[in-house]
Amino acid sequence: MIITTSRKPSQRTRSLVNDLARVFNFKILNRGKIPLSELIENKDDMIIVEELKGNPGRLKIFNFENNKILSMNLSLKLQREVSGKAFKNSGKLGSKFDKNTEHLKEFFFEYLFKKLSNYKEENFEVVITFKTVDESTFYIEVHKGSENMGPSLKIKTVKILDIE
């Protein structure tokens, strides 16, 4: 899976891309002047981190099998802000949903987890936790054991969009 940014990303956006690439073992594509239409034509599974007011503000996960996009508005804390260090996941990755985020499990499996070679249903070393803040907001955090390794994403909205 490829992760990239909108054009001319800020340092904070590039840091988020690097953090996500380390946790999920994504390949980073430095976009430069590549138009979005050209990225979509390749039909490679990808994630685009978009900016709002100079900070990472939206994450779009493309699913070309269904011609859909999982779009999330977010705020975040980077790895260096959460744990003070860069964490590289070299093991198996799993997920854990609380009762209020359980309804999102199939979306994240369909759009993200089933495309990861290191994702396992059990016997994993690193867990992606989904926990509720209130009825409209939840966190996605990366934990190794009981330690939060970062990044920590506060998801404000989740939408399913059509690829045009």
Curated annotation (Swiss-Prot):
Cited HAMAP family: BriX
Keywords in alphabetical order: Ribosome biogenesis
A single MF term (Gene Ontology): rRNA binding
Function as written in the Swiss-Prot or TrEMBL entry: Probably involved in the biogenesis of the ribosome.
Gene3D superfamilies: Probable brix-domain ribosomal biogenesis protein (3.40.50.10480)
NCBIfam families in UniProt: PRK00933.1-2 (NF002092)
Brix domain location: 1-164
Name of the protein in question: Probable Brix domain-containing ribosomal biogenesis protein
Highest rank taxon of the organism: Archaea
Record InterPro entries: Brix (IPR007109), Brix_dom_Rbsml_bgen_prot (IPR023548)
UniProt GO BP: rRNA processing
